[in-house]
A protein has these predicted regions:
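Bacterial Sec-dependent N-terminal signal peptides
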Residues: 1-24
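Ser/Thr/Asn(+Pro)-rich, low-complexity disordered segments
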Residues: 21-440
Length: 440
């Protein structure tokens, strides 16, 4: 009898060991640079495909529930990034074109019936019902920044899915319905020369947050200027977005002149979110050359991490990137002026167009050297802090999406070409007296 128990225990242990080996994530080594980029994009795409909300197809806010988010919580801005990732997956033939178009059509049909406020969607939405989930006590209505990231993706999808067949025709038409229904001018709060971030039927303008530059919100003003149905005046850009105490900079940090924004440039997502679709190459106006702005912002962030003035463990030429992310004590927007030792892979990887060599060095370090701790079923985890021996268990839609999209923009310029091909965007940029190679 005793021998039997020992035999049973041995068999059980063998089974557990075999299961552990089977469940261990395969991480191939010695890949070419191209194959590594393929793998990272494809693996990260799983967040927006395998983990998409099963009812609506919207992108879930995060992969864990550390902050009390339920499985029904989806993010509107992250969904826009997810739409762009579906385009990448289609172009690279990870999913079929018809499958992708039908997936996006399901999403768009859901959005047409979901809560919206003067055409704008809430920050968070229940992915099963379409009802608003309050982001905070008074933020229970429209969020035009999140909505802008959604439109960034939807307009790219409209341009990409251009076949003359029932599914793609319907997809384009319904995207246009949503786009044309957005009342940008409402969000000037009765005609002020600035756009306001929030409005709620319960709380009105109580959030009282005018959107002023320079930060991640430039796309809001470009879209509001591009609307054919409810546009805003150019003065809203020039007197609202531009006229702030933190718009112009002009100082030099680590040998790089920063035209706009906070000292040190702020978190790196400032140079990602608006520029997933908006191509900064040759984009300039009377205030800045936006390629110079974004590249120098990235180089300042890189050089700060390499110099590592606070002596955090792990910082190096192949381990850099400060942005908003999860961290050991919550969530924080990291930058050279707010550094807590936490590196987010999305920061360096979404900077591929600006710093390809430095970003590739970081990618190889994250994957080959730290991959046993950072690599996961949805690509890289959100962040890590080697000084604290802390590694996130989470992934966030707004961090995973830019990795896929900006690597693709580095490789092919796909999303840039799609977004900049929109007649409305070209019209809006002309209204702002901007220069771009895309303008005819």
């Amino acid at each position: 009898m005793k021998h039997r128990y020992w035999l049973l225990a041995a068999i059980l242990c063998m089974g557990i060991s075999a299961a552990a080996q089977k469940n261990k994530l395969y991480r191939p080594m010695n890949l070419s640079d191209s194959a590594l980029l393929d793998l990272v994009q494809k693996q990260t795409f799983r967040y927006f495909w395998d983990f998409a909300h099963p009812v609506s197809g919207l992108s879930r806010e995060r992969s864990n529930e550390n902050f009390g988010y339920g499985n029904e919580t989806t993010t509107i801005g992250g969904t826009g990034f997810g739409v762009m990732s579906v385009i990448v997956a289609t172009e690279r033939k990870w999913i079929g074109r018809d499958t992708a178009a039908r997936f996006l059509l399901k999403m768009v049909n859901f959005l047409l019936k979901a809560d919206s406020y003067h055409g704008a969607f809430p920050h968070w939405m229940n992915g099963a019902t379409g009802k608003t989930i309050p982001f905070s006590r008074k933020d229970d209505g429209a969020d035009i920044v999140e909505t802008s990231y959604l439109f960034e993706g939807l307009l790219c999808a409209r341009q990409y899915f251009n076949a003359d067949n029932p599914v793609e025709n319907e997809l384009r038409n319904r995207i246009n319905w949503i786009w044309e229904g957005m009342e940008w001018n409402w969000f000037t709060k009765g005609g002020e020369e600035v756009l306001y971030w929030h409005w709620s039927p319960n709380n009105g303008w109580a959030m009282n947050f005018p959107i002023r530059g320079f930060n991640e919100c430039m796309i809001v003003y470009v879209l509001a200027m591009s609307s054919q149905s409810n546009p805003v005046s150019p003065n809203v850009f020039h007197r609202g977005w531009v006229q702030s105490s933190f718009f112009n900079n002009g100082k030099t940090f680590y040998g790089h002149k920063l035209p706009l924004g906070f000292d040190g440039g702020g978190p790196l997502f400032f140079s990602h979110y608006s520029f997933l679709g908006l191509d900064p190459h040759g984009l300039q106006d009377g205030y800045a050359n936006y390629w110079e702005q974004n590249r120098n912002h990235t180089l300042i962030n890189y050089d700060y991490c390499v110099s590592n003035p606070k002596k955090f463990k792990g910082y190096a030429a192949n381990c850099w990137g400060l942005t908003a992310c999860d961290t050991y004590d919550g969530y924080n927007a990291y930058s050279p002026t707010n550094d807590g030792g936490t590196i987010a892979p999305t920061a360096a990887l979404s900077a591929f167009p600006y710093t390809p060599d430095y970003s590739m060095a970081a990618l190889k370090h994250f994957y080959y050297d730290l991959g046993d701790k950072l690599w996961s079923e949805y690509g890289f985890i959100d962040a890590f802090n080697e000084s604290k021996n802390w590694y996130a268990s989470s992934h966030l839609a707004i961090d995973q999406g830019p990795i896929i999209v900006m690597i693709e923009n580095y490789r092919s310029g796909l999303l840039w070409k799609l977004f900049m091909s929109c007649p409305e965007i070209q019209y809006g940029l002309k209204r702002l007296d901007m220069q771009s190679p895309y303008l005819k």
